[in-house]
Each structure stands twice: as structure tokens, then as C-alpha cells.
Amino acid sequence: PNIRKGYLDQHATLDGSKTIMEYLMGAFDYLFDLEKRLDALYESMGELSGEELDKAIAKSSRMQETLDREGFYDLDAKVKKVASGLGVNFLGYDTLISRLSGGERVKVMLTKLLLSELDIMLLDEPTNFLDIEHIDWLIKYLNGFEKTYMVISHDTKFLNAVSKFIVGIENGNIKKYSGNYDKYLVQHEMNEKQYREDYE
């Protein structure tokens, strides 16, 4: 299967000539590409007939269904919903990326990553530049996210709110714990105690 994945890279270089809205809309490039291919298919139908025309009609129907299912005709509202959740709306959608501070760019990158609705997301310190209300929004978003995400964070309150598993590196090994950060601490302490007893 074609697994779509992405990573919040806080040091990524962005195209400063784009506005915030143009950059965020880039999350849907695959849909804009699909629309172009659908338009080209419609144009070609005038030269088709019989079985070839039937196949083209069926294909165009599937493509149109994909656009409808993905909310292609409501992208503006979709972008603004996520952007406002993370406070990006206050930056101004027509603001050039080049005018943003480092922290503001990270917020914009996080917004685009969420809009991309990937199969796997890796979020590196996603709360670094967010206000409390925007962190709360992100918590609700991730708790409703039906696909896979991994979070690297020093914000233990945030980890408690969004974690279903904790992965730790212990004694040179990678270990997976069920539950949130508080549960991890309890299990980790028990394991450390057992480890010390085994080697005494």
C-alpha cells in the first residue's frame, strides 16, 4: 500500500515567496493534480466513442468521487479551521513566509502537516511555540486522529494527554510501554528496580 508519512522538521527551509495560505494549500497538491487530470480527461472525451468512452466516463466518475470525498471544494474552510486551532490565523493568510519568525514558521509547518492527513506523522516537540489554548486544541485533534502519530516531547503534561504508548531507551534497548507518561514512569521504575535486583 502507498503509505503517506510526514515529519515536523523545525529546521526545514520554506519558500519565503509564498503566502501562508499558498503554503498551507500545498497540503492538497495531490488533489489539485487530480483535478487537472480530470479536466484533461473530460477534454479527451470528445474524441472517444464506444467502449473507450465508457471507460473514460467510469474513470472520471471515480476521480470526481475522490475529490468530493476529500472535501476538495471546501478546502478553504478546512485550512482555516486547522489554522485557527493553532493560532496561525492571527498571522494573516496573505503574509509572506519570509516575514515570519522561526517560531511562527514552525506553527505554519505544523498546520500544513495536520492538513495533509497523513497515514503516519512524526511530531518533534510540537508544543514548542504554541499557547496553552492552541496546545489544548492540538490535544483534541490528536485524540481524534484515526491514523498513526509519534510524538517526541519534553512536555510531560502534553504526553500524558495524547499518548497511548511510550517508547523508552533503557540499558541500550528500546522498550514499549502501554499507557500515558505517568503510567510509563510507574512501569519504568518497577523495571529499573527489577534490573538492579537481577544484577546485585
Q: Whereabouts are the PLM-identified features?
A:
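ABC ATP-binding cassette signature C-motif
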Residues: 1-199
